Amino acid sequence: MAENSGRAGKSSGSGAGKGAVSAEQVIAGFNRLRQEQRGLASKAAELEMELNEHSLVIDTLKEVDETRKCYRMVGGVLVERTVKEVLPALENNKEQIQKIIETLTQQLQAKGKELNEFREKHNIRLMGEDEKPAAKENSEGAGAKASSAGVLVS
């Protein structure tokens, strides 16, 4: 019987834990958001480089005779085409890449807002961040100390 009451106590404790988020859960959520933001930024930077490459190739091919042979990598296979065939496809790809970059930029801005709201909601301070506002809150008294207990993330 003592074992059953011990188990009931543990399960009710874990139920209470679901209502209040622990510091580890807050840090994990914050790090997840930061990682998602980094992923979006990385993908946007990669597409920017690809866009620059497309622009360079398009500019070069515009100066060349349309009947000249050129080679294009399609699905890992090098295909022989003419400039006349390749140029419209490259320009179309460039436009699509620009649209994707715009979408990623909007997603990146939205993720930044979400990250800032999460920081404010959970009172998250990054290491090395200015700690003067926290010092002012702590000097106000014990009540302020309890409410300003935030999470420090490295």
Curated annotation (Swiss-Prot):
It holds the Pfam family Prefoldin_2. Keywords: Chaperone, Cytoplasm, Mitochondrion, Nucleus. The lineage of its organism: Eukaryota, Metazoa, Chordata, Craniata, Vertebrata. GO terms for biological process: chaperone-mediated protein folding; negative regulation of amyloid fibril formation; positive regulation of cytoskeleton organization; protein folding; protein stabilization. It is found in: Nucleus; Cytoplasm; Mitochondrion. Heterohexamer of two PFD-alpha type and four PFD-beta type subunits. Component of the PAQosome complex which is responsible for the biogenesis of several protein complexes and which consists of R2TP complex members RUVBL1, RUVBL2, RPAP3 and PIH1D1, URI complex members PFDN2, PFDN6, PDRG1, UXT and URI1 as well as ASDURF, POLR2E and DNAAF10/WDR92. Interacts with URI1; the interaction is phosphorylation-dependent and occurs in a growth-dependent manner. This is Prefoldin subunit 2. The gene is PFDN2. Residues 140-154 have a biased composition (Low complexity). InterPro entries: PFD2 (IPR027235), PFD_beta-like (IPR002777), Prefoldin (IPR009053). Belongs to the prefoldin subunit beta family. Residues 124-154 are annotated as: Disordered. Coiled coil: none annotated. GO terms for cellular component: cytoplasm; cytosol; mitochondrion; nucleoplasm; nucleus; prefoldin complex; protein folding chaperone complex; RPAP3/R2TP/prefoldin-like complex. Binds specifically to cytosolic chaperonin (c-CPN) and transfers target proteins to it. Binds to nascent polypeptide chain and promotes folding in an environment in which there are many competing pathways for nonnative proteins. GO terms for molecular function: amyloid-beta binding; protein folding chaperone; unfolded protein binding. Gene3D superfamilies: 1.10.287.370. Residues 124-139 have a biased composition (Basic and acidic residues).
